[in-house]
Regions:
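Cytosolic regulatory modules rich in charged/polar residues
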Residues: 1-159
Length: 159
């Protein structure tokens, strides 16, 4: 019951909470510079992470050109490992928001744009990014990754 009331209270706070309170700063973002990057090297970088969507740029990390949809790119790449794999087919246009947008407005934007990541810009300067996961964590608390979850068996080991 305590968790339920906390979630309800957090959802009511969404109209007051702003993106600037929950976004990931640019310095902590994982991004990829596509300039002069071979497809093989891109695959190597992607496989070293667990991200399904990665902001990408050419030369200037403040000018994100889009969000690489990893699953789409890898499917195309594995289907045709040649230069014919068009990277642009796997990059979606970024959804851009102001740091002063409320969480309510952000969620509405995520739904309308059919996106899960928004880039946070102020005066054409990239401040960071905010994800649907950030919003959910604000609502229900920290979300554990699958690898962080330890199954509970209910049985204790006997010594």
């Amino acid at each position: 019951e305590e968790n339920e009331s906390e979630i309800i209270q957090n959802s009511l706070d969404f109209s007051d909470t702003k993106v600037k309170e929950i976004f990931t700063p640019r310095e902590k973002m994982f991004t990829i510079n596509l300039k002069n990057l071979s497809l093989d090297k891109l695959v190597e970088i992607i496989c070293s992470t667990s991200y399904s969507r990665i902001p990408v740029y050419y030369d200037n990390p403040n000018k994100i050109v889009g969000i690489l949809l990893v699953k789409n790119f890898l499917a195309d790449y594995l289907d045709d490992k040649t230069v014919k794999t068009d990277l642009n087919d796997s990059i979606e246009k970024p959804f851009i928001v102001s740091p002063n947008v409320t969480i309510d407005e952000l969620v509405d934007g995520f739904q309308k744009q059919r996106k899960q990541i928004a880039l946070v810009y102020r005066n054409n300067v990239l401040l960071g990014m905010v994800t649907m996961e950030d919003v959910l964590e604000e609502l229900v608390g920290t979300i554990s990754e699958k690898s962080e979850i330890v199954p509970q068996t209910g049985k204790e080991k006997k010594k």
